[in-house]
């Protein structure tokens, strides 16, 4: 399973579409039909047949998904692909992150607050520092292979 934060932003939406597209391309390029005369390779061929990996996207309940949908459309997906699951929460909520990552082998952390307004310092520190710390700690706790 793949877990992505920041899917509604510029980088996260393109990363999501790229990973969905990579899976589609990989799935379509496989020829996994076992050849009857090659019985010894049937087991290895069958292991290539896998369902598309689930991609879990962390987003807030009030998130605007319009950018993500537009980017997916540019990659040829008119609807949210069926292997995408939404996890509603925030990177500052460690428990949600740990639960979402428990089966993840890849995690991509793209969530951030971007602002040049000095009055946003508290929010910047909370999301960008505390949120990233939570992401790293949850990934370590869950044994994520790729972060």
Descriptions of predicted regions:
Residues 16, 20-49:
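Short, basic, low-complexity termini and linkers enriched in Ser/Thr/Gly/Pro
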Residues 54-56, 85:
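A structural signal for isolated positions on well-ordered beta-strands in alpha/beta enzyme cores
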Residues 2-22:
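N-terminal Rossmann NAD(P)H-binding glycine-rich loop of SDR-like oxidoreductase domains
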Residues 79-130, 138:
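NAD(P)H-binding glycine-rich loop region in Rossmannoid oxidoreductase-like domains
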Residues 130-147:
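Conserved Rossmann-fold NAD(P)-dependent oxidoreductase catalytic core, especially the SDR/UDP-sugar
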Residues 56-79:
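Glycine-rich phosphate-binding loop and adjoining beta1-alpha1-beta2 segment
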Residues 1, 105-106, 146:
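Structural motif
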